[in-house]
Amino acid sequence: VQNVFGVCRGGLGLKGLAAPACGCGGLGYEGLGYGALGYDGLGYGAGWAGPACGSYGGEGIGNVAVAGELPVAGTTAVAGQVPIIGAVDFCGRANAGGCVSIGGRCTGCGCGCGSSYPY
């Protein structure tokens, strides 16, 4: 079982080094904030430690256990089954491609049916 409880945002990465010195590329999205020292930095994205050191990203073969919230931005591909015990809350769109089976009950989602019919 692999426990997912944090996130590695990385360090100084290629996008930050190649981006302009200030503005959107320097201290903003791909500079010292989100890209260079953040999400796409040394650990996670297109940086150096990702391919060389295998940074933590909550992926692997086996089971993944999540306690708390697991926010996901971007695309997440899941191959296999995802059994869920408890409640799942989607804020926004939840697009699914392929075959999706959902078993559960309508428990006050706001649709007005109030049905206990399993679907």
From Swiss-Prot:
**Region: Left arm, residue numbers:** 7-53
Keyword set, alphabetical order: Repeat, Signal
Q: The organism sits in which domain of life?
A: Eukaryota
Residue ranges of region Central domain?
Answer: 54-102
User: Where do the record's region annotations for Right arm lie?
Assistant: 103-119
Q: Where are the sequence repeats?
A: 28-32, 33-37, 38-42, 43-47
Extract the signal peptide range. Answer: 1-6
Functionally, this protein is described as follows:
This protein is one of many from the eggshell of the silk moth.
Similarity comment text for this entry: Belongs to the chorion protein family.
Quote the protein name from its UniProt record.
Chorion class A protein PC292
Q: What species is this protein from? A: Antheraea polyphemus (Polyphemus moth)
